[in-house]
Amino acid sequence: MEDNFASVVESLSGTSASALPLLTVSPADTSLKAPETKVQETKTEEKKPPKKRKSWGQELPIPKTNLPPRKRAKTEDEKEQRRIERVLRNRAAAQTSRERKRLEMEKLENEKIQMEQQNQFLLQRLSQMEAENNRLSQQLAQLTAEVRNSRNSTPKPGSPATASPTLTPTLFKQEGDELPLERIPFPTPSITDYSPTLKPSSLAESSDVTQHPAVSVGGLEGPGSALPLFDLGSGVEHDAANDIAAPLSDDDFHRLFNGDSSTEPDSSVIEDGFSFDILDSGDLSAFPFDSMVNFDSEPVALEGIEPAHGLPNETPYQTSGLQPSLGASTSRCDGQGIAAGC
């Protein structure tokens, strides 16, 4: 060994430098490379055979033993019994699971059908509502256009409407208007609206009887007759159906007391008052006041006279209500006791 080493050294020292080969190192040679390890797969010679799946509905053998449920199986027959019981339990559980899944699928199918029908119905309703909405929008636009045209168009001049008493400007005062009281109409209701049987002629007659006593004029109609109160002339006819009398004026009173005079009536009676010289010795008891009052108990026939409308009581009053009570004097009595009968 030592001899070989010495010979190599001598040979190297004896050779020239030019004869020695140049050693070069590439970068690829300096890189580290992992050694390739080949993994050898160990194949086990003893492999278990694959478990063969038994077909569905295979008849199971009848167990030879009758092992209680909670007892451990020890023998091969007992283990076979446990296997058969396990297979039966699995078959029952699988059947129950399949039935449950079938019911769930049927329920889902029914719900799907119902949802499809409801979706179809809602789509139809949506189309109907859209059509209705479009129709209403068109109608609204048409009405808006009509209202706008009616506002822009000027009204045609027509016949002037009659002024209504309830719509006159005098009844509704506007802001900033000063309305005097004399311009506001205050209608006075007629007295015939409150009394259904009271006539204007009877009202005027009753007022004239109390204010101007009747004067008996002899020789006109006969002895003891009184001058008619409303004898205003021979050309005036009293119609019961159209008896609308006005209050008597001074000229009417002049014609009343001077009815037989064709010339201008004498106003001395009105100016000087009633003359008591026409009576015998100025006795008022001799004046026939009873002839001027109708004491007839029969009611006055008011047929043909239009009653007042809108009043509940339309029965005429009887003249018997004007008769004095039993024991009262029928002659004129005053507070001074002028009449003899008082």
From Swiss-Prot:
Residue ranges with Basic and acidic residues bias: 35-48, 74-88
Cysteine pairings via disulfide bonds: none
Location in the cell: Nucleus
Stretches for region Leucine-zipper: 136-143
Gene3D superfamilies the UniProt entry points to: 1.20.5.170
GO CC, any one term: nucleus
Region (Disordered): 1-105, 146-167, 306-330
Pfam families assigned: bZIP_2
Descriptive protein name: Transcriptional regulator of the unfolded protein response hacA
GO molecular function: DNA binding; DNA-binding transcription factor activity, RNA polymerase II-specific
Keywords linked to the UniProt accession: Activator, DNA-binding, Nucleus, Transcription, Transcription regulation, Unfolded protein response, Virulence
Record PANTHER family: TRANSCRIPTIONAL ACTIVATOR HAC1
Polar residues bias locations: 315-330
Function summary: Master transcriptional regulator of the unfolded protein response (UPR) that recognizes and binds to the UPR element (UPRE) in the promoter of UPR-regulated genes. In the canonical UPR pathway, the ireA RNase splices the cytoplasmic mRNA hacA, which alters the reading frame to allow translation of the bZIP transcription factor hacA. Induces the expression of pmrA, scrA and spfA in response to UPR.
Signal peptide start-end: none
Sequence ranges assigned to domain bZIP in this UniProt record: 80-143
InterPro entries per record: bZIP, bZIP_sf, Hac1/HY5
PROSITE patterns for the chain: BZIP (PS50217), BZIP_BASIC (PS00036)
Knockout consequences: Leads to reduced capacity for protease secretion and impairs growth when challenged to assimilate nutrients from complex substrates. In addition, exhibits increased susceptibility to antifungal agents that disrupt the membrane or cell wall and shows attenuated virulence in multiple mouse models of invasive aspergillosis. Affects the expression of only a small amount of genes. Leads to hypersensitivity to agents that block calcineurin-dependent signaling. Impairs the UPR-dependent induction of spfA.
Organism: Aspergillus fumigatus (strain ATCC MYA-4609 / CBS 101355 / FGSC A1100 / Af293)
Biological processes annotated in GO: endoplasmic reticulum unfolded protein response; positive regulation of transcription by RNA polymerase II
Region (Basic motif): 82-135
Similarity field: Belongs to the bZIP family.
SMART domains, sorted: BRLZ
